[in-house]
Amino acid sequence: MSNTEKNLPTKYDHMSVEEGLYQWWLEGKYFEATGDEKKQPYTIVIPPPNVTGKLHLGHAWDTTLQDILTRTKRMQGYDVLWLPGMDHAGIATQAKVEGKLREEGISRYDLGREKFLEKAWEWKEEYASHIRQQWGKVGLGLDYSRERFTLDKGLSDAVNKVFVQLYEKGLIYRGEYIINWDPATRTALSDIEVIHKEVQGAFYHMNYPLTDGSGHIRLATTRPETMLGDTAVAVHPEDDRYKHLIGKTVTLPIVGREIPIIADEYVEKDFGTGVVKITPAHDPNDFEVGNRHDLPRILVMNEDGSMNEKAGKYNGMDRFECRKELVKDLQEAGVLVEIEPHMHSVGHSERSGAVVEPYLSTQWFVKMAPLAEKAVALQQKEEEKVTFVPERFENTYLRWMENIHDWCISRQLWWGHRIPAWYHKETGEVYVGTEAPADIENWNQDNDVLDTWFSSALWPFSTLGWPNEDSADFKRYYSTDALVTGYDIIFFWVSRMIFQGLEFTGERPFKDVLIHGLVRDEQGRKMSKSLGNGIDPMDVIEKYGADAMRFFLSTGSAPGQDLRFSMEKVESTWNFINKIWNASRFVLMNMDDMKYEEIDLTGEKSVADKWILTRLNETIESVTRNMDKYEFGEAGRSLYNFIWDDFCDWYIEMAKLPLYGEDEAAKKTTRSILAYVLDQTMRLLHPFMPFVTEKIWQHLPHEGESITVAAWPTVREDLQDTEAAAEMHLLVDIIRSVRNIRAEVNTPMSKKVQMQIKAKDEAVLAQLTKNSSYIERFCNPSELTIQTDLQAPEKAMTAIVSGAELFLPLADLINLDEERARLEKELEKFDKEVERVQKKLSNQGFVAKAPAAVIEGERAKEQDYLEKREAVRQRLADLEK
């Protein structure tokens, strides 16, 4: 694609810039890991998106951060593997496929399991193709030769092996437990699939009569229909109000069942009446209480949310219909004494919207405590631990690991990894294995599939060839270097990958975890369908381009923080790219057919040349350091300031002097510096804005095929000149001050005015005299005087800069009162700066701990502010003469 035409198109058009480039990168195989043993490997596995539809802004943000990391490392000489893949997303995908079938008047049961799975695979193929297209639009440098899917054979083999090994170790078991149950889809749900909503409900206050006829005990519930499964009433053992009742029984209203009054510390004495009904089959806390007291578990609902035969006369009713009828009956019986309105949080299925039912069910579980112990212990080993960025999320992770519950891993679905367990048709014997029993005709396989998170937990190593530990990719690229993900799935995914990685590979699955927040709208609200505030990243790309979206997403927040998405800010980024484009056009038009090998930085340089090269060095150092710390926002801001302010607004303007002059040697040096600085800047910017940087770089004199594999910039000490940088800062301060004064008195730059500069000493005088051509070019004086012993002219506008005072005698334009007010404001500013720096230097803690260079820097600031303050005071005194 090499294109060293000197002219870019006149206008920046993101559509034409981005068109075709991604395909060109893929054809060049620039994103494929090479396996080159001379290079250090660097690995990231993409958090696999669900094959359920379009990618959202959160995906765009998450993958952009990964792309920035991998593009940077590739340019730094690493053998980079960024492995793509997708998740089968059990319930989410099955719900989508079932929804599509319903539109055709078909249920999954009409099709049967095999035919339904064919439909699910068709869905997967269609939406996987959409996702790849979206990845391409964002510009993600993925190694598609290694793409994986959680239901691929290799990954399925890994899942079965892990299940069997955990089962053989006694870490997977089958038992009864309270799970989140979705009556609409008839499956267990993980906590992340439950959305909690504030709902207007009620406390139903009831009197349960003591069986001996001596009175009653009052309690309240928000789910009266579950009372049909009550097997006890509980009070706190130290509650003096009820101590005398412990061991007695009450008669369950309507049902007539005699149930005990028990004592348990689970009960809060000060909440409500201090009495709670215990329904072990319909509440997780009650289940635990029931286990402690050996209470029976009475399940009163069917899987579809209807009441079963244990509910007596309410058998067959929907649970909410039962609630209405039961409340009427309780009122008629005189048991229900009050209905108190109550707003409370109720779990709803993320997929079906149905109210989730805590439900007793026989499921498969992972025994978590032994696995979590190893993961917690790992964090005590400084060299082996997983590093969380920001660090505070390590505590979040550890808190959860230290208070972990067993994990329900079975789901009543068809789409997913079918549990590798079989039941003997005659004996009921359970067989668990990676292969089916030899006499398969005598066995029935478990109908359930595994929780999607079970296979996702193996993602960092199953994608690299495990359980074949001799796999070339597994040996070279595991463990991975970084995981980029949101804080909302630390528990559900990050923690599980860590303990499974430790259990089956003996290593952490990744060295670093970079945590980001959620994408919110400009008002800070979570994006959702109900609010109608969601934004499709493809729409953003169409309007402003992937580069603009990527730069905003990657620089718009700090690690761990939420991101407020703003189209206005994306537009501002587009304007920034447009400025880069125009600056690049200027550079290219002045290259005079220069070849890469003709770039020569050894010629005599102006102060502006030395300054821009020094600033480039500083920017390279800042960007590289911040990238290493995952501070993409800071890195991006360093680049933005350098490109917009230093390169475009100052250096390019100053470069016009030699470019349009007669000195051929100066022209050549300036062209070389323009080409070099733009080349290095495009490389630094490339991970953020891959498309436009490739386009510009291809037009620049360059070597190599693509910027994607060009070397990352490094600081060049031979181009560092801090003295020249200080000289340039003085020039910039003078030019800015003159422009500000002219603006205050409405004197356009085109109008020539007399200008006088009083240099602090001979050294400053020499600097300013040497660089006077810049002052004349950018300040447009009719006459320029630079001396060390100047007297301030009467009625002159004044500015104070480090090392000099400026005077613009604008007698006819000055309002003395306004000038006095302006100087008093300046004096106030310098008073505050002097106070601030002196306070810092008088702080013994600061002086004792700060590096000597920092303290010296503060003392230099103090001296500078004192001199500026004195100059302003003198000027105010002159005005009073």
From Swiss-Prot:
Coiled coil: 810-881
InterPro entries assigned: aa-tRNA-synth_I_CS (IPR001412), aa-tRNA-synth_Ia (IPR002300), Anticodon_Ia_Val (IPR033705), M/V/L/I-tRNA-synth_anticd-bd (IPR013155), Rossmann-like_a/b/a_fold (IPR014729), tRNA-bd_arm (IPR010978), tRNAsynth_Ia_anticodon-bd (IPR009080), Val-tRNA_synth_C_sf (IPR037118)
Motif stretch ('KMSKS' region): 526-530
Alphabetic keyword roster: Aminoacyl-tRNA synthetase, ATP-binding, Coiled coil, Cytoplasm, Ligase, Nucleotide-binding, Protein biosynthesis
Reaction(s) catalysed by this chain's protein: tRNA(Val) + L-valine + ATP = L-valyl-tRNA(Val) + AMP + diphosphate
Any Pfam family matching the protein: Anticodon_1
An MF annotation (GO) of this entry: aminoacyl-tRNA deacylase activity
Superkingdom field: Bacteria
Residue ranges annotated as motif 'HIGH' region: 49-59
Subunit-level organization: Monomer.
Protein's job: Catalyzes the attachment of valine to tRNA(Val). As ValRS can inadvertently accommodate and process structurally similar amino acids such as threonine, to avoid such errors, it has a 'posttransfer' editing activity that hydrolyzes mischarged Thr-tRNA(Val) in a tRNA-dependent manner.
Domain notes: ValRS has two distinct active sites: one for aminoacylation and one for editing. The misactivated threonine is translocated from the active site to the editing site.
Name the UniProt record assigns to this protein: Valine--tRNA ligase
Lineage start: Bacteria, Bacillati, Bacillota, Bacilli, Bacillales
